[in-house]
């Protein structure tokens, strides 16, 4: 849940408004006719802390449909996702990104690598994240408190 909404908050910074849909983390892809957590042009983004066989099957379907799957996961699971993709014959066809690098690269880019602007950029991402939580989830305790200094 947190992972998916942090990714959504980051995407909101760089994508035009309403260019992709944001769903509650408990909303399954199947019933909503989605190919992944985020569909942006021909890229399908999957957010998970536990990559598994079902996710790799979704990636296969993405590729068959002419779209490009990207898995965003936690650092400890990057190699798991890469190994699963390789075992399924998808090596080099599925991107796998560590969420911390995905987010921190954005913070550095949007702050123009100026340390004095980093907290402001991070605060913007967290504010967007908190709004997403309030709009899509029933548990407000998922919000993040951040005091930009």
Where are each of the predicted segments found?
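Catalytic core segments in nucleotide and nucleic-acid processing enzymes
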Residues: 2-149
């Amino acid at each position: 849940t947190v992972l998916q909404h942090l990714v959504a908050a980051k995407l909101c910074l760089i994508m035009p408004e309403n260019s992709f849909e944001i769903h509650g983390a408990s909303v399954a892809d199947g019933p909503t006719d989605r190919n992944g957590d985020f569909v942006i042009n021909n890229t399908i983004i999957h957010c998970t802390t536990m990559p598994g066989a079902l996710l790799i099957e979704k990636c296969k379907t993405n590729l068959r449909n002419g779209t490009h799957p990207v898995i965003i996961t936690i650092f400890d699971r990057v190699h798991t996702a890469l190994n699963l993709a390789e075992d399924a014959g998808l090596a080099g066809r599925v991107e796998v990104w560590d969420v911390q690098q995905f987010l921190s690269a954005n913070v550095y880019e949007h702050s123009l690598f100026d340390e004095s602007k980093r907290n402001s950029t991070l605060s913007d991402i967290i504010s967007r994240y908190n709004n997403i939580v309030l709009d899509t989830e029933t548990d407000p305790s998922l919000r993040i408190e951040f005091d930009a200094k």
